[in-house]
């Protein structure tokens, strides 16, 4: 069995395409590739005879209303009248309320501040817990020997203990290492 292939020639009609001259009024206003509503198509058709020129390079149009209301058109098609400073904008307008945006930003900042406070509190708890463990270990090591407070004032020992929250033994040791200097003793003990 053999198959045969036949070629069939169709008559194709040439379509007449009319080109508009750039001198025509409203030549820049044309139906875009986007799906347009019926009202938009009617508006474009009505504006073709006015003589509008398309303005390129505009990515966003914002119209401000009283009380902080904004109307934003993303990716607009903007046309300018050649006779006056009148602009016509096509696109989907979305309403934005600046007071709501400000409230949302304030709430977000508050949440971030609370998160930072929680992290700081956790880190302080962790450091104080590890510091308490170190203090217990140091006290256990030094509990066997008696405290030698010779050459150190009792008021200085109490002051170092209050400032650093350390044991009496550690305060005496820090004061002896710094030769009685309170500031250096506090820095060494902390």
Curated annotation (Swiss-Prot):
One of its GO terms (cellular component) is nucleus. Residues 20-42, 123-155 are annotated as: Disordered. Residues 138-151 have a biased composition (Acidic residues). GO terms for molecular function: phosphatidic acid binding; phosphatidylinositol-3,5-bisphosphate binding; phosphatidylinositol-3-phosphate binding; phosphatidylinositol-4-phosphate binding; unfolded protein binding. GO terms for biological process: cotranslational protein targeting to membrane; protein targeting to membrane; protein transport. Part of the nascent polypeptide-associated complex (NAC), consisting of EGD2 and EGD1. NAC associates with ribosomes via EGD1. Residues 37-102 form the NAC-A/B domain. It is found in: Cytoplasm; Nucleus. This is Nascent polypeptide-associated complex subunit alpha. Residues 152-189 form the UBA domain. Residues 30-40 have a biased composition (Basic and acidic residues). The lineage of its organism: Eukaryota, Fungi, Dikarya, Basidiomycota, Ustilaginomycotina. Component of the nascent polypeptide-associated complex (NAC), a dynamic component of the ribosomal exit tunnel, protecting the emerging polypeptides from interaction with other cytoplasmic proteins to ensure appropriate nascent protein targeting. The NAC complex also promotes mitochondrial protein import by enhancing productive ribosome interactions with the outer mitochondrial membrane and blocks the inappropriate interaction of ribosomes translating non-secretory nascent polypeptides with translocation sites in the membrane of the endoplasmic reticulum. Belongs to the NAC-alpha family. SMART domains: NAC (SM01407). It holds the Pfam family UBA_HYPK. Keywords: Cytoplasm, Nucleus, Protein transport, Transport.
């Amino acid at each position: 069995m053999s198959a045969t292939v036949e070629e069939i020639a169709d008559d194709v009609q040439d379509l007449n395409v009319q080109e508009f001259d750039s001198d025509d009024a409203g030549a820049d206003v044309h139906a875009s590739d986007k799906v347009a509503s019926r009202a938009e198509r009617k508006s474009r058709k009505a504006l073709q005879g006015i003589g509008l020129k398309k303005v390129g390079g505009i990515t966003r149009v914002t119209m401000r209303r009283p009380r902080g209301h904004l109307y934003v058109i993303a990716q607009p098609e903007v046309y300018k009248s050649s006779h006056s400073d009148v602009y016509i904008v096509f696109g989907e307008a979305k309403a934005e309320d600046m007071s709501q945006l400000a409230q949302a930003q304030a709430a977000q900042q508050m949440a971030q501040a609370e998160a930072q406070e929680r992290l700081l509190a956790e880190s302080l708890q962790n450091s104080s817990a590890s510091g308490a463990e170190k203090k217990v270990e140091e006290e256990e090591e030094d509990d066997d020997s008696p405290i030698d407070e010779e050459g150190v004032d009792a008021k200085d020992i109490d002051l170092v203990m209050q400032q650093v929250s350390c044991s009496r033994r550690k305060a005496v040791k820090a004061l002896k290492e710094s030769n009685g200097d309170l500031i250096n003793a506090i820095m060494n003990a902390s």
